[in-house]
């Protein structure tokens, strides 16, 4: 075993990572099928070829599996470090893309394909970290586990949630690194910024259902179900959200430059939700013939709440805003767990911060919260410090690829992310880091 850091040919590593990601995104693991048998086999083959033990966990749903790889410490002095990513991806319509979304095309310095950023790129960064630890004979002070899950894009019923509920003893980590935050370039006056998520917004999904007497479309009236529903929706969507700073976002604003940073956050679509609860109208239905005013109509809303928002008080406020006996407010989903914010002093956060600044010395590393949902919440709910960061440095144009058209990961960011995760892992799990 070696106790110092061997020299690494990062050009060769970058080429290998690019090839791996190109092959990985060629495997269609999109929903609604969300099959991960082939993706797990792809990762397991690369790990096993270099003597890294893997185990595949078959979930109760056919075609959906989770993969665990482990590098064991001879004399562990702490619980494992867990590197997490998900193998499933959202759908893509090939006709709308520059390249086929499952081609893995490498062009213009990017790997194109659905999942290249969310979240197969992260998976390859973690794969390369495991391979480098093994190849370089790094002596470990704790086990390092790589977890690749299914079902993250639909709430993880057969993925991280199922693993935590049924196989937690096989993981039992001290710290978890997952997706949820990113490095951003060109967003802040303060310069490059790595936003490390230490918590995430919680989700409440509600449905407004309007009921009234039906009738002929030639004779509309004020209290028709569709009219009631539209008025209720306007009331809800027009309500100004109250801005407030959670502790993590307050620290973020401080590190990025105070009030200037607050204005920058508030002006950007991707970061504005950090400051308040959000309500998005996502589904509408009602009616069955164009000349009939229906007796029922409904709208569904995806609501994302700041970690300190009381979800029942939030729903109660929605009911007061709607205030129409002909419109009911139904809760489709409550948050799965209470919010648990990871600390941003010491531990894995400090290791991430040091690693990021090793490669980008002038960058700002700051805690933040994830405005979406990730697998990390299932580990945070167990009290495990869990951090989200895909450690590339992304532009606004890059970030459009998340669930969007022409999703792509730059070769440069794949390299940077691998360097940062490997460096972080050495700081957390190597007996000697130099």
What residue spans do the PLM features occupy?
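Loop/turn elements at helix/coil->beta-strand transitions in domains of secreted/extracellular proteins
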Residues: 50-52, 79-80, 142, 171-174, ...
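Acidic/histidine-rich catalytic neighborhood of metal-dependent amide-processing enzymes
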Residues: 111, 117-195
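Acidic/His- and Gly-rich active-site-bordering loop/insert found
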Residues: 2-114, 135-142
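Metal-dependent amide/peptide-bond hydrolase catalytic core
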Residues: 1-5, 12, 60, 182-190, ...
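Conserved hydrophobic/aromatic beta-strand scaffold that supports enzyme active sites
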Residues: 66-70, 176, 207
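Cysteine-centered functional microenvironments
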Residues: 65-68, 110, 115-116, 182, ...
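Short beta-strand segments
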Residues: 84-86, 148, 178-179, 209-211, ...
């Amino acid at each position: 075993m070696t106790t110092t850091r061997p020299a690494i040919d990062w050009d060769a590593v970058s080429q290998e990572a690019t090839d791996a990601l190109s092959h990985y995104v060629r495997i269609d693991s999109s929903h609604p099928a969300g099959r991960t048998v082939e993706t797990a086999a792809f990762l397991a083959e690369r790990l096993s070829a270099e003597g890294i033990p893997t185990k595949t966990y078959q979930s109760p749903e056919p075609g959906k599996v989770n993969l665990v790889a482990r590098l064991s410490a001879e004399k562990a002095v702490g619980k494992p470090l867990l590197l997490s990513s998900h193998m499933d991806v959202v759908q893509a319509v090939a006709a709308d893309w520059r390249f086929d979304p499952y081609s893995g095309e490498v062009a213009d310095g990017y790997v194109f394909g659905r999942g290249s950023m969310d979240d197969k790129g992260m998976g390859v960064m973690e794969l390369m970290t495991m391979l480098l630890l093994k190849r370089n004979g790094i002596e470990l002070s704790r086990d390092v586990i790589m977890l690749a899950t299914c079902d993250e894009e639909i709430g993880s019923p057969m993925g991280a949630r199922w693993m935590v509920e049924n196989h937690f003893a096989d993981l039992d980590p001290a710290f978890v690194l997952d997706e949820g935050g990113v490095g951003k370039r060109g967003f802040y006056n303060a310069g490059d910024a790595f936003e490390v998520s230490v918590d995430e917004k919680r989700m409440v999904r509600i449905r407004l259902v309007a009921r009234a007497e039906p009738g002929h479309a030639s004779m509309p009236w004020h209290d028709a179900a569709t009219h009631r529903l539209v008025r209720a929706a306007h009331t809800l969507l027009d309500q100004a959200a109250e801005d407030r700073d959670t502790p993590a976002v307050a620290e973020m604003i401080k590190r990025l430059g105070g009030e200037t940073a607050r204005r920058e956050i508030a002006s950007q679509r991707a970061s504005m939700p950090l400051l308040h609860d959000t309500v998005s109208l996502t589904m509408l239905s009602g009616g069955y013939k164009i000349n009939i005013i229906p007796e029922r109509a409904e709208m569904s809303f995806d609501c994302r709440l700041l970690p300190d928002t009381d979800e029942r008080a939030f729903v109660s406020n929605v009911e007061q805003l709607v205030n129409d006996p002909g419109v009911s407010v139904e809760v489709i989903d409550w948050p799965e767990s209470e919010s648990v914010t990871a600390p941003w002093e010491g531990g894995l956060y400090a290791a991430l911060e040091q690693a990021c600044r090793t490669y980008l010395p002038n960058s700002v590393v700051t805690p933040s919260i994830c405005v979406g949902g990730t697998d990390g919440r299932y580990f945070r709910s167990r009290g495990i410090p869990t951090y989200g960061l895909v450690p590339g440095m992304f532009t606004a144009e890059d970030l459009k690829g998340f669930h969007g058209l022409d999703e792509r990961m730059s070769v440069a960011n794949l390299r940077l992310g691998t360097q940062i995760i490997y460096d972080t892992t050495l700081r957390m799990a190597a007996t000697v880091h130099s």
